Structures are given as C-alpha cells and as structure tokens.
Amino acid sequence: MSRADFHQQQAEQATREAQRLLAQQATLGPRWLGWVASELYQLSPPEYAAMVRRELQRLTSPD
C-alpha cells in the first residue's frame, strides 16, 4: 500500500482520534500532555501515530 493510499484510508480515523485526545485536555489539566504522549506512543503503526500527532497540532494551533 502506498503512503498516499494509507493516508487516505486513515485520515478520518486519525482526525477522530485527535479529537478524542483533545477532548480530555480540560479533564486532565496539567497531566494532559503526559497522557497524550503515552496515548500516541501506543498507537500503531508509527505512520498513523504521526498522522494523529499532526492533526492534534492542527486542532490546537491558532489560525
């Protein structure tokens, strides 16, 4: 499977996962960053984890 195919197939799921992680920010407060890091570490394959990480950056960066 090509990188483009993988990205296309996983993009929606990566966005949902990033939104799920971001939704916990208010609940976890200052512990959120460490929690997110451990959640990202558990994602597989690494290419998918990178997609979720990029989506988190997009969702949290000011416009």
What are these language model-derived features?
Residues 22, 60-63:
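A structural signal for well-ordered alpha-helices, especially hydrophobic packing surfaces
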